[in-house]
């Protein structure tokens, strides 16, 4: 992105930077293994924290993270029975390795996690969390993950009221609470005893059943939920929408779908005791004088008409710049005039921004409602950023928040769809006037294959990018001084055994039908090899308008090849004559003349 693009840093300062605090209760039931194959709930929670920290140090190094245990016999700081296992700071290699030790040797580490004999006040724990966030994470988006199997933390009405008041304080401080309720050994976790009121205050809604993670298996779901927070939500650009007669409103745009790719952020020097960020420097030197060139001594040139046109930096900026960023409505058209093939790039989502121009939201809402009521689209002149190429866009209003899939929601607003210009529209090659039609049994068999391989419940949001995940694994191993992994599991590979089981029989039928059909076509075009009782099929020679015969007999072509004059003879033919020869033999007729000559020569060699 250009350095001079308009991004409101003050508004988006906290966007994309997260402060995550794990708050885990320590009790005898949390320390006991779930079964002989599943570790204890406390160990699972610490493993989850380790996996998250190892992931964030690569993908979001600016995030901060901490782990607070409560209900322990020992204490750190002034809060009784609360242990700050990991201070809320950016995760680094040493902190991550300390969490990793709980995964490898939890039995040795859990001795210091001895639970206390008294019940710990949850109100004191929540107050401790608010102190941590306000003192160390003021400019971050705050997430608190409460992991417990105690469904009755309030022992009397007074303690209940204090805990609920702490919940209001967390909400006022913009601290989002994400509880993970684990089932104790004796019964299922009972939300209605206390936590239904707690969650009503935190979330501000009556029905919270779908917002609560329950059961030990939900620890991994919690990790997936935190991982989803890593996608940046900053605006793509801010600009003014011009409505005419000096009427403008503020808008901001977002890209809802964007391919996430691995990007190099820094060079690292790896030969020292510790990795160090290397700052590369480059200089431009004159080839003639060997002296370093200054900025004002460098020019850019473009070739035009056999000569070079030289531009200075200021001149080049003037040529590239059309006008300041703007979105200018120039008219409206019926919605039916917009075709699916008009979309050149992914659509950009637009919404109002009232910070600079008061009333932008009201005007934007009026435009949105009018487009929907009239079944129209807006046509606008669009320049997204300084030095960006201008284009025409269609403004599409969405009627409301629409769940396209379980993992993707189409929001309420206006989408900008870039429209093609005359230079963008391309014509297709001419269509064969006599296309080969497939037999009906082949079409029916292919339909069965497609129905058998249909993924009815496919959700793209559930599949990670395999190359990106492998890239992160290698970076994580280097950052933590671990062995570089060699095994790679790609979950996007087709399940060949399942495919063979479902449609393997139909695939064999398709191959047989195609082979039979190919033989029939070969018979009709006269290129089938000699049958057992028949000699080679001899085709009649065509006569061009010029009267020159085309070598249409295979024997004649073979004889010319043996004599070594085939290349000379066929090069003298016209392209139309070559295509006739190839078409009669069922060979490809597309490409340049050299391609046609190669196709015919290769065919004769096989005779």
From Swiss-Prot:
Q: Which reaction does it catalyse?
A: ATP + H2O = ADP + phosphate + H(+)
Which GO CC terms are listed, alphabetically? chromosome, subtelomeric region; chromosome, telomeric repeat region; heterochromatin; Ku70:Ku80 complex; nucleus; pericentric heterochromatin; site of double-strand break
Q: Which top EC class is given?
A: hydrolase
NCBIfam families recorded for this chain?
A: ku70 (TIGR00578)
Instruction: Indicate whether Electron transport appears among the record's keywords.
Output: no
Protein name, UniProt field: ATP-dependent DNA helicase II subunit 1
Q: Which GO terms describe its molecular function?
A: 3'-5' DNA helicase activity; ATP binding; ATP hydrolysis activity; damaged DNA binding; telomeric DNA binding
Q: Where in the cell is it found?
A: Nucleus; Chromosome, Telomere
Q: Which family does it belong to?
A: Belongs to the ku70 family.
Query: SUPFAM superfamilies under this entry?
Result: SAP domain (SSF68906), SPOC domain-like (SSF100939), vWA-like (SSF53300)
Give the gene that encodes this protein.
pku70
PANTHER family to which the protein is assigned, alphabetical: KU AUTOANTIGEN DNA HELICASE, X-RAY REPAIR CROSS-COMPLEMENTING PROTEIN 6
Which regions span the lipid bilayer?
Answer: none
What InterPro entries does the annotation carry?
Ku70, Ku70/Ku80_beta-barrel_dom, Ku70_bridge/pillars_dom_sf, KU70_core_dom, Ku_C, Ku_N, SAP_dom, SAP_dom_sf
Domain spans labelled SAP: 570-604
Q: Which GO terms describe its biological process?
A: DNA recombination; double-strand break repair via nonhomologous end joining; replication fork processing; stalled replication fork localization to nuclear periphery; telomere maintenance
Keyword terms of this UniProt record: ATP-binding, Chromosome, DNA damage, DNA recombination, DNA repair, DNA-binding, Helicase, Hydrolase, Nucleotide-binding, Nucleus, Telomere
Q: Which Pfam families match?
A: Ku (PF02735), Ku_C (PF03730), Ku_N (PF03731), SAP (PF02037)
Enzyme Commission code = 3.6.4.12
- What function does the entry list? Single-stranded DNA-dependent ATP-dependent helicase. Involved in non-homologous end joining (NHEJ) DNA double strand break repair. DNA-binding is sequence-independent but has a high affinity to nicks in double-stranded DNA and to the ends of duplex DNA. Binds to naturally occurring chromosomal ends, and therefore provides chromosomal end protection. Required also for telomere recombination to repair telomeric ends in the absence of telomerase. ku70, of the ku70/ku80 heterodimer, binds to the stem loop of tlc1, the RNA component of telomerase. Required for mating-type switching.
PROSITE patterns cross-referenced by the UniProt entry: SAP
């Amino acid at each position: 992105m250009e350095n001079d693009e308009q991004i409101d840093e003050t508004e988006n300062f906290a966007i994309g930077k997260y402060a995550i605090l794990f708050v885990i209760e320590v009790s005898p039931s949390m320390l006991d293994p779930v079964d002989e194959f599943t570790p204890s709930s406390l160990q699972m929670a610490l493993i989850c924290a380790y996996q998250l920290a190892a992931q964030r140090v690569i993908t979001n190094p600016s995030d901060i993270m901490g782990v607070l245990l409560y209900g322990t016999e020992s204490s750190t700081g002034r809060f009784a029975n609360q242990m700050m296992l990991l201070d809320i700071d950016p995760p680094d290699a040493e902190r991550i390795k300390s969490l990793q030790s709980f995964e490898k040797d939890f039995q040795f580490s859990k001795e210091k996690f001895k639970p206390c004999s008294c019940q710990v006040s949850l109100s004191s724990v929540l107050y401790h969390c608010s102190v941590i966030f306000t003192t160390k994470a003021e400019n971050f988006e705050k997430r608190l993950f409460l992991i417990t199997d105690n469904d009755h933390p309030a022992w009397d009405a007074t303690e209940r009221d204090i805990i609920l008041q702490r919940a209001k304080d967390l909400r006022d401080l913009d601290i989002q609470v994400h509880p993970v309720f684990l089932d104790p050994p004796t019964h299922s976790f009972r939300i209605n005893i206390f936590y239904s009121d707690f969650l009503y205050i935190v979330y501000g809604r009556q029905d919270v059943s779908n917002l609560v993670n329950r059961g030990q298996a939900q620890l991994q779901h919690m990790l997936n939920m935190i991982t989803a927070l890593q996608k940046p939500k900053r605006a793509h650009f801010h600009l003014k929408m011009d409505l005419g007669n000096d009427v403008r409103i503020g808008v901001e745009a977002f890209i809802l779908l964007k391919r996430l790719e691995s990007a190099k952020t820094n060079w690292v020097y790896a030969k020292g005791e510790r990795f160090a960020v290397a700052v590369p420097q480059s200089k431009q030197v004159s080839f003639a004088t060997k002296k370093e060139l200054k900025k004002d001594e460098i020019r850019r040139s473009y070739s035009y008409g056999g000569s070079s046109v030289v531009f200075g930096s200021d001149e080049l900026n003037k040529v590239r710049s059309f006008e300041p960023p703007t979105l200018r409505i120039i008219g409206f058209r019926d919605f039916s005039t917009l075709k699916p093939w008009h979309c050149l790039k992914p659509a950009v989502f637009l919404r109002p921004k009232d910070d600079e121009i008061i009333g932008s939201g009201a005007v934007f809402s009026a435009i949105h409602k009018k487009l929907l009521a009239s079944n129209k689209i807006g046509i606008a002149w669009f320049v997204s950023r300084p030095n960006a190429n201008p284009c025409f866009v269609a403004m599409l209003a969405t009627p409301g928040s629409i769940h396209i899939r379980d993992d993707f929601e189409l929001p309420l607003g206006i989408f900008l769809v870039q429209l093609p210009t005359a230079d963008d529209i391309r014509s297709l090659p001419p269509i064969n006037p006599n296309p080969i039609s497939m037999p009906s049994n082949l079409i029916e068999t292919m339909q069965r294959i497609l129905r058998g391989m249909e993924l009815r419940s496919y959700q793209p949001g559930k599949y990670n990018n395999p190359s990106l995940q492998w890239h992160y694994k290698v970076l994580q191993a280097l950052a933590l001084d671990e062995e570089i992994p060699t095994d790679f599991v790609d979950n996007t590979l087709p399940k060949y055994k399942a495919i063979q089981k479902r449609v393997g029989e139909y695939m064999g039928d398709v191959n047989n039908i195609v082979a039979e059909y190919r033989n029939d076509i070969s018979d009709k075009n006269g290129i089938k090899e000699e049958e057992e009782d028949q000699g080679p099929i001899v085709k009649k020679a065509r006569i061009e308008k010029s009267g020159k015969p085309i070598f249409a007999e295979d024997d004649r072509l073979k004889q010319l090849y043996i004599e070594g004059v085939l290349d000379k003879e066929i090069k003298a033919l016209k392209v139309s004559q070559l295509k006739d020869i190839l078409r009669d033999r069922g060979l490809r007729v597309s490409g340049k003349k050299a391609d046609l000559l190669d196709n015919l020569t290769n065919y004769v060699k096989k005779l």
